[in-house]
């Protein structure tokens, strides 16, 4: 059976979609272009599983690109949303006590976040944090890292990761040269390069923004001393250190990567998990910096739906579950089981891969490794990855359709899901070894 025969309704839906939306999707990677398939159209999610309109069931490791750490339609999240709809409403454009609760949870979990502002997306969080850093320091330049993705604001689409990397356009048309000139790009995990940049332009640099665990060129952990070195350099030059924890916040640890690695940034950006699957973002940090945000200070930022009760209640319900004893130990156990099995399956087939993992986020790079930065990530065999992806999808395993995206474990996954995934990978690796596509 051909792929078009296996997914006829999805093929028809996508044919209509491309006439209505650019590329047929509302976010580029969803189009499945880099893996050579038409995307399955999803009908529903339940726990660790997705079901498409053609009747296929998948074990899901995309988790809506990270937010669904509890799995799809977790009962406590559903109950919270139903209660909010029934008793409150959808949005008021006015303060609610729920906002206080979520802000309190975030600031308690992350001591570096002394005050927080809720927004509607990770992009809003990072662009607002950077404006704040520039306004606070009176400087204009920012240092980012090649392959790190911080949303689609102009000044971040310079050697970016995520979809920009997947489609080979890390520098997007439409980004003004004057904006790009104030963005300095350094290699991830290269502290010497950062030191050199600061020696040349340190007095002009407002901030360094970094994914403490890069997740948008695949999962790339920080080398020992890298994050601590960034903290030392930024303090020395009076620049701010911004952790983009949109992906890692409440995933790699309840207190995020800053808790895992013991680093205290000046500003933190959040999203994904704190909305429980609904659109959300947040940025926060030291009180003296955050008090510069309007209406307390002159640095403006606003949003119609910021702090809306639906997203906030879903986020609160999610964090409540994550705070239960044994939660992160469970995620680690499942993730380690999968890592061991995938490594063994690849080795048995003689397929060179590198498995990078931090907690419940991971990537299988088709690359003998090590993978520590943009250059080594992009040296991966994307054709082999595409073949692996197709083989896994046909066996009911739903992975991110890009070599350069992290995958995610959820609390809804079970040991038999992991074992099923390993068995599917064993067949997929065997196929790659003999040249199947």
From Swiss-Prot:
Cofactor(s) in the UniProt record: pyridoxal 5'-phosphate
PROSITE patterns, per database record: AA_TRANSFER_CLASS_3
Location, primary (coarse class): cytoplasm
Reaction catalysis annotation: (S)-4-amino-5-oxopentanoate = 5-aminolevulinate
Gene giving rise to this polypeptide: hemL
Alphabetically ordered keywords of this record: Cytoplasm, Isomerase, Porphyrin biosynthesis, Pyridoxal phosphate
Protein name: Glutamate-1-semialdehyde 2,1-aminomutase
Species: Moorella thermoacetica (strain ATCC 39073 / JCM 9320)
Gene3D superfamilies linked to this entry: Aspartate Aminotransferase, domain 1, Type I PLP-dependent aspartate aminotransferase-like (Major domain)
Places the protein is found: Cytoplasm
One GO CC term, this protein: cytoplasm
Record GO terms (molecular function): glutamate-1-semialdehyde 2,1-aminomutase activity; pyridoxal phosphate binding; transaminase activity
Keyword Metal-binding: no
Quaternary structure (record): Homodimer.
Bilayer-crossing regions: none
Family indicated by similarity: Belongs to the class-III pyridoxal-phosphate-dependent aminotransferase family. HemL subfamily.
PTM annotation (N6-(pyridoxal phosphate)lysine): residues: 272
């Amino acid at each position: 059976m051909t792929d078009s025969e296996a997914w006829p309704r999805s093929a028809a839906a996508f044919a209509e979609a491309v006439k209505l939306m650019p590329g047929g999707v509302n976010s580029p990677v969803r189009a499945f272009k880099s893996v050579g398939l038409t995307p399955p159209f999803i009908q529903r999610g339940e726990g660790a599983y997705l079901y498409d309109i053609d009747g296929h069931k998948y074990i899901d490791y995309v988790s809506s690109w990270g937010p669904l750490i509890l799995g799809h339609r977790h009962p406590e999240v559903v109950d919270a949303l139903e209660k909010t709809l029934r008793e409150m409403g959808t949005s008021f454009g006015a303060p609610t006590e729920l906002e206080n609760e979520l802000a309190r949870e975030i600031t308690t979990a992350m001591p570096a976040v002394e005050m927080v502002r809720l927004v509607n997306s990770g992009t809003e969080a990072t662009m607002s944090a950077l404006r704040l850093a520039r306004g606070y320091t009176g400087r204009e330049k920012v240092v980012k890292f090649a392959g790190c993705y911080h949303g689609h604001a102009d000044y971040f689409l310079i050697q970016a990761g995520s979809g920009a990397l997947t489609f080979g356009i890390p520098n997007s048309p439409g980004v003004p040269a004057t904006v790009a000139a104030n963005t300095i790009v350094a290699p991830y995990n290269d502290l010497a390069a950062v030191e050199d940049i600061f020696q040349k332009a340190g007095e002009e640099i407002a901030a360094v923004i970094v994914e403490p665990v890069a997740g948008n060129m695949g999962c790339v952990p920080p080398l020992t001393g890298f994050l601590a070195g960034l903290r030392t350099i930024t303090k020395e030059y009076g620049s701010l250190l911004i952790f983009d924890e949109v992906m890692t916040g409440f995933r790699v640890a309840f207190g995020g990567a800053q808790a895992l690695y013991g680093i205290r940034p000046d500003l933190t950006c959040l999203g994904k998990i704190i909305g429980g699957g609904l659109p959300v973002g947040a940025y926060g940090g030291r009180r003296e910096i955050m008090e510069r945000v309007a209406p307390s200070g002159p640095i403006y930022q606003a949003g119609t739906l910021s702090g809306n009760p639906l997203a906030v209640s879903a986020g609160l319900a999610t964090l409540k579950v994550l705070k239960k004893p044994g939660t992160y130990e469970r995620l680690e156990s499942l993730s380690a089981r999968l890592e061991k099995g995938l490594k063994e399956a690849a080795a048995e087939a003689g397929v060179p891969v590198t498995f990078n993992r931090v907690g419940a986020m991971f990537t299988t790079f088709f690359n003998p490794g090590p993978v520590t930065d943009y250059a080594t990530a992009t040296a991966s065999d994307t054709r082999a990855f595409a073949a692996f992806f197709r083989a896994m999808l046909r066996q009911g395993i739903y992975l991110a359709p890009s070599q350069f995206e992290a995958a995610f474990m959820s609390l809804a996954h079970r040991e038999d899901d992991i074992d099923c995934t390993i068995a599917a990978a064993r067949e997929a690796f065997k196929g790659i070894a003999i040249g199947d596509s």
